[in-house]
């Protein structure tokens, strides 16, 4: 008797393994791993937006592990050494906002806080208008203005319920703002 769960897992694995490095004509295990982590962390549509075009993986000279993902010459992701997940760069945030409808991965802030957050300052709960209900504590998020323009990237320090209920406290620890990339 066949196990349908195993058959399903094998089909998904075969789809993932179809990633081929066209220049070499062979499998690129690092690229497969990089895409798999992005799909797990951000979801399939967002990962596809991040990995479109020509991909260059920057690896550590010492360990050989993936450190940065460059897509069409733009730095879109950096991999954290501690847990093997990605930190999102502003170019990556722009690609996700273009490809995936709101509210996916987004925290929307009031106009009053846009100048501060875009400079790299943290986003506080009292200035948040809305957020993705699927955000988990410490997830990578995109901070946007009310017109869905990305202004910063960072990590969620509160869950959606807390963000909407609290009058004080840091909602997003901002890593980089829009003005950092200009």
What is the meaning of each model-derived region?
Residues 56-61:
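Substrate/ligand-engaging "lid" and interaction regions
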Residues 3-10, 31, 90, 111:
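Low-complexity, intrinsically disordered regions enriched in charged/polar residues
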Residues 14, 23, 36-55, 71-130, ...:
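Beta-strand/loop-dominated core regions that host nucleotide or nucleotide-derived cofactor-binding catalytic loops
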Residues 1-26:
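Helix-rich terminal scaffold detector
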Residues 65-66:
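Terminal interaction modules at protein C-ends
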Residues 30-36:
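Charged, low-complexity, helix-prone segments enriched in Lys/Glu/Asp/Gln
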């Amino acid at each position: 008797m066949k196990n349908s769960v195993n058959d399903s897992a094998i089909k998904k694995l075969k789809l993932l393994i179809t990633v081929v490095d066209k220049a070499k004509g062979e499998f690129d295990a690092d690229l497969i791993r990089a895409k798999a982590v992005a799909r797990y962390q951000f979801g399939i549509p967002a990962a596809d937006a991040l990995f479109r075009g020509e991909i260059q993986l920057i690896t550590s000279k010492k360990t050989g592990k993936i450190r940065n993902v460059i897509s069409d010459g733009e730095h879109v992701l950096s991999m954290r050494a501690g847990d093997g997940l990605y930190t999102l760069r502003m170019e990556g945030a722009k690609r996700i906002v273009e490809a995936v409808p709101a509210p996916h991965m987004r925290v929307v802030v009031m106009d009053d806080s846009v100048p501060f957050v875009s400079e790299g300052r943290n986003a506080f709960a009292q200035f948040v208008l809305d957020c993705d209900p699927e955000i988990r504590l410490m997830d990578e998020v995109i901070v946007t203005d009310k017109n869905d323009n990305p202004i910063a990237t960072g990590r969620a320090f509160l869950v959606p319920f807390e963000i909407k209920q609290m009058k004080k406290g840091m909602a997003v620890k901002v890593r980089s703002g829009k003005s950092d990339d200009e």
